[in-house]
Design a protein with these regions (language model features):
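Active-site-adjacent structural elements that line small-molecule/cofactor binding pockets in enzymes
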Residues: 1-289
Length: 289
């Protein structure tokens, strides 16, 4: 199992030196990857019609692919993971170009987690349809993979038209791994059919194992091998008392099919980026051995 960290988007602040130091410390501790959340816009909770989302315009969100360009130069081994990028509110060819550039600058260290999103405000502001986002994401992935693996691409789809054109440079990974987030059955079936992996939100245990086994069944139905399909869990330290970290970690390691895990330090009241690093050091000592 590869164990990484969740970048503390809403708590890390805006100091580039602190962000660099955080990433380098994570890499030096031996964590394998850094996973970054994505939101382009935050809504005003006092807007007409109200607001029920967990984030507002007051929460800091560094743009993941721009951030990865910075982190690519600051690190050497750390895998750079979007978890997730809200793909349908973006233009697919542009994302393919941006992702390819990150992959080149990082020496092939990008993993692109994508999902359909839930924030209609962002879709409206970015000029994309919220209603069709589920249908469009599959064609977007197909278009991006073509652009990542061919010098010239000809596409005439329902949502995309590329008249014999391509991106340059192509990425190091051809294609870049695409994982999907989301919990509904239709989303999980889509991931099993078209993605390289899935990013769920659950605690380890028998109920989670039942879900993983069901997903592996969907993968087989799609004519694919579960051994080639990754699943990344999320260990939120705010949900588990420190005295139970080792036990929870053992439960994760005991699950079949979990290939990756990200340790999440947001929500603990940590006041600085350095405090997040210290918490990850403590977790490594007490839970990873």
């Amino acid at each position: 199992m590869r164990i990484g960290v969740v970048f503390p988007q809403v708590e890390i602040g805006q100091d580039p030196s602190a962000i660099r130091d955080y990433a380098q410390a994570v890499e030096a501790m031996g964590y394998t990857h850094v996973l970054v959340f994505d939101h382009v816009l935050g809504a005003n909770p006092e807007r007409p019609g109200g607001w029920k989302g967990p984030y507002t315009f007051r929460h800091t969100f560094h743009e993941p692919l721009v951030l990865f360009g910075f982190l690519a130069a600051a690190t050497r081994r750390l895998e750079l993971v979007t978890g997730i990028l809200i793909l349908p509110q973006r233009q697919a060819a542009l994302v393919a170009k941006q992702a390819a550039t990150v992959d080149v600058l990082s020496g092939g260290r990008l993993r692109l987690g994508v999902a359909v999103g839930w924030n209609a405000v962002e879709f409206e502001a970015l000029g994309e349809s919220f209603r069709t986002r589920g249908r469009r994401i599959e064609e977007q992935i197909e278009v991006m993979r073509a652009l990542w693996t061919k010098d010239l691409v000809r596409v005439q789809g329902q949502w995309h038209s590329i008249p014999d054109a391509g991106i340059n440079p192509l990425p190091v990974q051809r294609p870049i791994p695409v994982w999907m987030g989301g919990e509904s059955d239709v989303v999980v079936r889509r991931a099993a059919r078209v993605a390289d992996g899935w990013m769920p939100h659950f605690r380890p245990g028998s109920a989670a194992q039942t879900v993983v086994d069901r997903v592996h069944g969907y993968v087989k139905e799609a004519g694919r091998a579960p051994v080639d399909f990754g699943i990344e869990g999320r260990f939120a330290l705010s949900q588990v008392p420190a005295a139970e970290w080792a036990q929870e970690m053992a439960a994760w390691r005991g699950m079949r099919g979990i290939t990756h895990l990200s340790v999440h330090t947001v929500g603990l009241g940590l006041p600085t980026p350095a405090a997040h690093v210290e918490m990850l050091e403590r977790f490594k000592k007490e839970a990873l051995g």
